[in-house]
Every structure is written in C-alpha cells, then in structure tokens.
C-alpha cells in the first residue's frame, strides 16, 4: 500500500475465542502512521490478546492488515521478561544474540560489540555489558528491551504495559527513552497502559476496549 494516509496497522472484525469464551469480539481499529495509540480498558478486556494476535502468536478470525512503507519490522516490549537468575546471559550478550550469526560461545564480533555498547549507552546502561540479566532492576530490563526492540528501527512498535511494576522514576526514564527512540523516526506505536497519566503524557490517540469490544476512540492532546 503506497497511500501515505493508510494506517500502518488495521484490524477488521478481529475475533479471538478461548473455548466457548469470546475474548475479542469483532474488534476493528486503525493505527495512524507515526502516532502513539494507547489501548486502554479493564483487565480481561483483551488488550494483550490483541497484541498476541498481531504478532501471530494465537489463532484469530477476521483480518489483520499491515500497510508497510519500509521493511515491515515489528518491535515488541512485553510487560515482563522472565529470566532465570541462574542463567549467565549478560545484557551485552542478550543484545548481541540477534545481531550476529556466529554463536556467542565463539565470542562477540568487534563491530557487533561496538553496536551493543552504543545501544547500552543510549539506554543509560553504559558499563552493563557484562552484567547478568538476572541482576538488572525492572527499569533497567525494560530499557534494555526497548533498546533491543527499536534497533534497527521498526515500523511498528508494540508495548504491552511496559511500565508495570516500575517506580515513578523508572517510568519517567523509560518514557524519556521511548521519546528519544521515536524522535524523527515515525515509528507507529501501540501502547497498552493502565496509567491515565502516562496515556496523557504519551498518546495522541486512544482506543478503549470494554468487554472485548471497541467502545471509544479519540484523539488526545500531547502534554
């Protein structure tokens, strides 16, 4: 699709069932290009299920349409990233995993290491390359995941309650890094959030799910 006005992501009558239960019921929404769209609603409304459908992780009915302008890359930051505290994988190795072809047991290539060091520095994690993932705080882990999800720049960024469990300072730092990652890039973003203040700070478009049905969509002013 070459129409510049076309949404980057569009769902049409998206329905997800779990047994006899309908989790998403004919949900139709569109994400304007370059926007941050907040997806809000009560627990159990199907917000995370919608992201799982977009990522192709679950079966669904209806249509999910992508109107790509570049390479169609999707970045994703989950609500939580479960790590085994005994796993020796470090922050630097985590970023290197998808940035080189050779196994990590053979070492990290010099060019990849330089790239990883740059990503860590941009995420305020300079000097953390050798720190095991299990030793990162919640805020540090979320900034690491954001750095991973936005390099290379995606066309669509999915954030599933990325600030859950973080204190106010960590939330604000995450938001600062999100703004920096999006600055001038035109990354279309879908943000799930239960924090009205965060939605007001970040979103310029809001979609409300109520009982798994889109009940309200509106534009909001950025603060």
Residue ranges and their predicted role:
Residues 168-170:
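Helix N-cap at the start of a conserved alpha-helix in ABC-type nucleotide-binding domains
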Residues 205-219:
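H-loop (His-switch) and adjacent beta-strand-loop-beta switch element
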Residues 157-160:
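Catalytic Walker B motif of ABC-type/P-loop ATPase nucleotide-binding domains
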Residues 132-136:
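Conserved ABC ATPase signature
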Residues 110-128:
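Conserved ABC ATPase "signature" region
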Residues 40-42:
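The feature captures the beta-strand-to-loop junction immediately N-terminal to the Walker
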């Amino acid at each position: 699709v070459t129409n510049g006005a076309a949404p980057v992501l569009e769902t049409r009558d998206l329905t997800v069932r779990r047994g006899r239960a309908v989790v998403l019921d004919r949900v139709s929404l569109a994400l304007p290009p370059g926007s941050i769209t907040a997806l809000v609603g009560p627990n159990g409304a199907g917000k995370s299920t919608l992201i799982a459908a977009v990522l192709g992780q679950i079966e669904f009915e209806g249509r999910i349409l992508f109107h790509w302008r570049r390479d169609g890359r999707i970045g994703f930051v989950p609500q939580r990233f479960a790590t085994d505290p005994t796993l020796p994988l470090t922050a630097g190795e985590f970023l290197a995993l998808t940035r080189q072809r050779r196994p990590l047991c053979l070492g990290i290539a010099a060019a990849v290491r330089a790239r990883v060091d740059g990503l860590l520095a941009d995420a305020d994690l300079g000097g953390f390359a050798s720190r095991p993932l299990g030793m990162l705080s919640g805020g540090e882990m979320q900034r690491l995941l954001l750095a991973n999800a936005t390099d290379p720049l995606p066309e669509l960024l999915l954030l599933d309650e990325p600030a859950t469990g973080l204190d106010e300072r960590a939330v604000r730092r995450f938001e600062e890094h999100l703004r920096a990652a999006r600055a001038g890039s035109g990354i279309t973003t879908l943000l799930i959030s239960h924090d009205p203040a965060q939605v007001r700070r970040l979103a310029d478009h809001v979609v409300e799910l109520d009982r798994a049905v889109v009940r309200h969509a509106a534009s909001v002013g950025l603060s």
